[in-house]
């Protein structure tokens, strides 16, 4: 798929297992949304073959649409429509919809059911968009950034609902900027960059890194200038140091007592008081950083 002289999706090949949750990850502009929109039938592929539930999303659109649910980034609701009116309207388009009152209560929409769409908070709009995607009892649901703008409780509720869908045999394909969300939910993860697949596997397969681990250092006061580079030099060239914010850094490298001792010694020499020093396995975020060199959403992150 190209837009002018820009290639959005370049020879991408992926498959999704029935009854699973699959996460499609990548930096901004990697081609995630274009990929999903092609699978949903909103864009015609310029080459290659796309099959969703065995059907061509373009040629077999009428047969496919009743079997899938789509949560759009823009939600697709009129600005003046009330939340419950919109959900009931979508429900009437399906032969055997879910009970709208149950779905609204499940997603915490009851209190804003009479509120016009334009007055809903970002999180409420997201929850309404998810409800609209699910009300038709889809076999396959595409969710684009399902928890963006939600508070922690709303995010957890959405996670529970997506897990319940998987238990009921529904296939879920999601994109997300929250790498913790992908690691928590996904059975399979596809990471794409510049329209190409660069990694694929289960979260465990992708994060399994032998002796490589992460050390997270949180201190009581902001780091002094040049702290990141200073710590990297103290640890050696085989270690990566990422400044997460003014009081925390992540060290990725060999998992042994020597690494922890060097970090502690650096803190002492630089008069930095640790609040916590923790050792853990590589996360999906670490893998993403290694593969793309980018960290989503975290402003001011520096990576060496």
Regions of interest found by a model, annotated:
Residues 1-193, 198-199:
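ABC transporter nucleotide-binding domains
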Residues 18, 111, 219-221, 255, ...:
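Non-catalytic surface loops within mature trypsin-like serine protease
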Residues 26, 114, 243, 277-279:
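Hydrophobic/anchoring residues in structured secondary elements
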Residues 54, 93, 221, 253, ...:
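Short loop or secondary-structure boundary microenvironments that flank
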Residues 94, 210, 235, 281, ...:
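Conserved NTP-handling cores and scaffolds of large molecular machines
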Residues 159-254:
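ABC transporter nucleotide-binding domain
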Residues 255-304:
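C-terminal coupling/interaction segments
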């Amino acid at each position: 798929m190209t837009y002018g002289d820009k290639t959005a999706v370049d020879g991408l090949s992926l498959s999704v297992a029935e009854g699973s949750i699959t996460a499609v990850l990548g930096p901004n502009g990697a081609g995630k949304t274009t990929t999903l929109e092609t699978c949903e039938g909103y864009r015609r592929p310029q080459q290659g073959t796309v099959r969703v539930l065995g059907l061509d999303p373009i040629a077999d659109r009428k047969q496919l649409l009743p079997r899938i649910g789509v949560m759009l980034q823009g939600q697709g609701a009129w600005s003046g429509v009330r939340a419950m009116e919109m959900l009931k309207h979508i429900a009437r388009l399906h032969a055997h919809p879910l009970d709208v009152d149950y779905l609204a209560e499940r997603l915490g929409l009851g209190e804003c059911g009479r509120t016009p769409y334009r007055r809903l908070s970002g999180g409420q709009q997201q929850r309404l968009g998810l409800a609209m995607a699910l009300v038709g009892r889809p076999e396959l649901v595409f969710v684009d950034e399902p928890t963006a703008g939600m508070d922690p409780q709303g995010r957890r509720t959405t996670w529970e609902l997506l897990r319940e869908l998987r238990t009921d045999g529904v296939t879920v394909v999601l994109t997300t900027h929250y790498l913790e969300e992908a690691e928590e939910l996904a059975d399979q993860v596809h990471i794409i960059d510049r329209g190409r697949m660069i990694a694929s596997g289960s979260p465990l397969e992708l994060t399994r890194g032998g002796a490589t681990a992460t050390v997270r250092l949180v201190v009581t006061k902001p780091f002094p200038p040049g702290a990141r580079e200073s710590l990297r030099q103290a640890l050696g060239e085989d270690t990566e140091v990422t400044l997460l914010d003014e009081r925390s850094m992540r060290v990725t490298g060999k998992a042994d007592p020597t690494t922890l001792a060097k970090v502690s010694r650096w803190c002492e020499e630089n008069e930095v008081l640790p609040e916590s020093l923790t050792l853990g396995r590589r996360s999906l975020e670490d893998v993403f950083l290694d593969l793309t060199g980018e960290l989503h959403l975290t402003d001011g992150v520096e990576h060496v």
